[in-house]
Amino acid sequence: MAARRRPAAGVGARDALAVLALALCTPGVGGGALEWYSAMVSIEYVDPQSNLTVWSVSESGRFGESSLREERQGLVGVPRAPAPAEGCAPDTRFVAPGALGNAPWVALVARGGCTFKDKVLAAARRNASAVVVYNLESNGNATEPMSHAGTGNIVVIMISYPKGREIFDLVQKGIPVKMRIEIGTRHMQEFISGQSVVFVAIAFITMMIISLAWLIFYYIQRFLYTGSQFGSQNHRKETKKVIGQLPLHTVKHGEKGIDVDAENCAVCIENFKVKDVIRILPCKHIFHRICIDPWLLDHRTCPMCKLDVIKALGYWGDPEDTQELPTPEAAPGRVSVGNLSVTSQDEERSESNLPSSSSSESGPHRPCLKEDAGEDTALLGAGRSEPQHGGSIC
C-alpha cells in the first residue's frame, strides 16, 4: 500500500509573506521621501581682547522647506533692543554692527513667539539677504524642519541654540560678525503617506485571510492523514493476528522431510538449519518465521508464487467477499510442503481408534512423522478421510 505523504507545513505562510513583500516593494507604494539640505555656516570676527581674527566653520545649519538653496554672506544683524529676540513684529528694526549703506546683511532671530513665516517676512522688509533662526534651548544642538511657505525668494536656515546664542551675544556687544552660508549635504528621509498605510493594511488583511484559509486546509489534511495512519495501524494488528494462525514447524536433526543442505528460505537465501522455526504458507512454500512474518505485514503475498496469503485464509474484505481456504492437492490425511509431511492431529486420533483387526490385517507398518506436543501444527485445507483397511495412516 502506497504511503500517503504528510502535508508540508509553512508553504501557505511563505506565499502570503511573499505577496506582502511584493506589495510593499511596488514602486510608488512607499509613500514618498522628504528631501532636505544641510547648510555650511562659517563666521568670522575680531576678538576685541586679543585683537585676533576668530574664524569657525561647521555643517550645523538646515535649510528651510521653502528656502532658496543658494550661497549668502554678510554681516549679522539682530533685533534692536528692547525688541524681543524673536523678531516677530512687522516693524521690527535690526542692528548690524559694521554694516555700510546697502551692503548685504543676515538677520539672526530666536525661535518662538510667532510662525517662521512672520519672522522671515519681518526681516525681508528690512532687506535682509538671509534669515537665520536659532533653535530653542531645550532642543540643544538639534535642528528641525521649518515650514515658511509664501516668503518669496530668500534664504532661510536654522542653526542650533548654542551656536546661535554665541553669535547673538557677540552682535549685541557691538562686535561685527561676518557670516557665510553655503549648501551642505543632500538628505533623503523616507516617510509613509496615508494612502500607503491603507494599501499596506489591505495587503496585511489579505495575507491574514490567505493564512487562515491555508491553516484550515492544513489541519483538515492533517486530520485525514492521522485518520489514515490510525486505520493502517489497526490494519497491521489484524494482519498480525491472521499471520499468527499460519502453522509453524521446527526443523529437527535427521528429519526426512527437509534436506537441510538443499532447502533454503527464499527471503534470506539461507539454508534451513536444525531447530530453525519455519512458517508454512497455504501455497505449501516454507520460510523462516522471522523472515516471512515482516514480509507478509508489508506485502501479504508469498515471495515465490505471489499468492495473497491473507485472502487465501479468508480473513480479508467484506463478509460476502471472504474466500474459503483452498484445499491443497495432496494425499488424504497430510499436507505436503516440499518434501515435508505434517500429520494432522485429527488423523492421529482416527489412527488410534482403528479396530485391532485392521491393524492385524495391515501387517507391520512404518512409524509416522509426528510433531512435538508443544508445536503449533495445522492441517491446511485437507479434508478428513476414513481409514482404509489394509493400509497404514501416516
From Swiss-Prot:
Recorded metabolic or biological pathway in which this protein acts: Protein modification; protein ubiquitination
UniProt KW Amino-acid biosynthesis keyword: no
Record's signal peptide: 1-31
InterPro entries per UniProt: PA_dom_sf (IPR046450), PA_domain (IPR003137), RNF149_RING-H2 (IPR042712), Znf_RING (IPR001841), Znf_RING/FYVE/PHD (IPR013083)
PA domain boundaries: 66-171
Zinc finger (RING-type): 265-306
This protein's record includes keyword Cell division: no
Disordered, as annotated region: 321-394
Keywords: Glycoprotein, Membrane, Metal-binding, Phosphoprotein, Signal, Transferase, Transmembrane, Transmembrane helix, Ubl conjugation pathway, Zinc, Zinc-finger
Primary localisation category: membrane
Membrane topology category: Single-pass membrane protein
GO CC, any one term: membrane
Record-given protein name: E3 ubiquitin-protein ligase RNF149
Species: Mus musculus
Originating gene: Rnf149
